[in-house]
């Protein structure tokens, strides 16, 4: 899980979702998981 000021899709399978007011990127590649901090 990377914590970043700006989250972006890394690959076509990444999805940007909002969970409890926090932007997250979920992907089948665990290295692409991100959260806005």
Swiss-Prot record:
Pfam families, sorted: Ribosomal_L36
Record carries keyword Ribonucleoprotein: yes
UniProt GO BP: translation
Superkingdom to which the source organism belongs: Bacteria
Keywords, in A-Z order: Ribonucleoprotein, Ribosomal protein
UniProt record similarity statement: Belongs to the bacterial ribosomal protein bL36 family.
NCBIfam families: rpmJ_bact
The protein's name in its UniProt record: Large ribosomal subunit protein bL36
């Amino acid at each position: 899980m990377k914590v970043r000021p700006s989250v972006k899709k890394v690959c076509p399978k990444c999805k940007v979702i909002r969970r409890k007011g926090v932007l997250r990127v979920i992907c089948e590649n665990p290295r692409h998981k991100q959260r806005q901090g």
